[in-house]
Structure formats: C-alpha cells, structure tokens
Amino acid sequence: MLAGVDKFVGTDLEKILKEKGAKTVIVVGTAAHGAVLYTASAAAMRGMKVIVPVDGVSADTTYIEQYVAWHLVNVPVIGPAFTLTTIDQITF
C-alpha cells in the first residue's frame, strides 16, 4: 500500500477490513516507530483488537522496538486493545 505511516489514511484499508468483518488485526513491519506504531494505534482507535508480535517488528535500534512495544500497551484509552506476543503464538 502506498501511504504514510498510518496505513488507514489515504487507503481503502478500513473499508476492506469492515467488508471482511475483521475485528482483530495483526500488525508487523520494519518501522516500529513509524507504520507499526501509527497503524496499530489507528486500528485500536477504530475499535479493533490489535495483535503485535514483537518478533515481527523491527527498528534501527532495540531501544526503539522496546519503546514502541511498551508504548502500545501503556498508552491511555487504547492500550487495552493491544496484545503483544510472538509470531509462533499466533493461530487462526
């Protein structure tokens, strides 16, 4: 998808997820402090549950990865929407 850091902005992502009846999303990526943080937060603000496998995200430094994980689960209001896990723990 061609978009900024929030993949809901300027795309049909929200429409597609609604059409599919998705209530939970799994967010992964190589920019923990960019698209992962903003897209995960945007999904939570839209009432979705968000799963973030910590071994499915990366950043320039380990500190950034750890901060983003901490921030997601500790942010006021939407923090409870997030579940941190690992890729091998995700099942469908």
Indicate where each model-derived feature is located.
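Active-site-adjacent betaalpha module
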Residues: 1-92
